[in-house]
A protein has these predicted regions:
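Cleaved targeting-peptide boundary
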Residues: 23-31
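Cleavable N-terminal signal peptides
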Residues: 10-12, 21-22
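A glycine-anchored, Pro-Gly-centered beta-turn/N-cap motif
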Residues: 87, 92-98
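Short, surface-exposed alpha-helix to beta-strand junction/turn motifs within ectodomains of secreted
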Residues: 47, 51-71
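Extended, polar beta-sheet/loop recognition surfaces of beta-rich domains
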Residues: 31, 37-41, 45-52, 107-121
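Bacterial N-terminal signal peptides that target proteins for export
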Residues: 1-11
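N-terminal signal peptide c-region/cleavage motif recognized by signal peptidases
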Residues: 17-19
Length: 121
């Protein structure tokens, strides 16, 4: 029994303390605009920041209005390997939803939504 515990304890420790990046999915940690925010401009700069590297060429960001109609986005380059950026121009006042889907460097897909309202004067 002692021999069994002698080699399984270090093995379990290696498994449990393994590289967090190996098990990490790309989770959204910050967005601009943040969820349920009111934006006071007809131009909205979108930044989605994740907790790990993403495969930007295999990610999607879509914007829809309150009726679910797609709204054009201009994707922009980000220097950070964990961030997506886009700009929406000429938004009318109303509710909008950002729909994102990313492929993490670990090969897992995560997706989510961020809602915001435009109330510009």
């Amino acid at each position: 029994m002692t021999r069994f515990l002698g080699w399984t304890a270090p093995l379990a420790l290696v498994f449990l303390a393994g590289s967090p990046a190996a098990f990490a999915h790309a989770m959204l940690v910050r967005s601009s605009p943040s969820d349920q925010t009111v934006v006071r401009s007809h131009q909205v700069n979108i930044a989605l920041d994740y907790d790990s590297r993403i495969e930007t060429s295999r990610c999607t960001v879509k914007l829809t209005d309150a009726a679910g109609k797609p709204v054009p986005l201009q994707m922009e380059h980000s220097a950070k390997p964990s961030e997506l950026n886009a700009v929406a121009h000429g938004l009318a006042n109303g509710k909008y939803q950002i729909h994102w889907q990313v492929l993490a460097s670990d090969g897992h897909i995560t997706r989510g939504d961020v809602a915001f309202t435009v109330a510009a004067q």
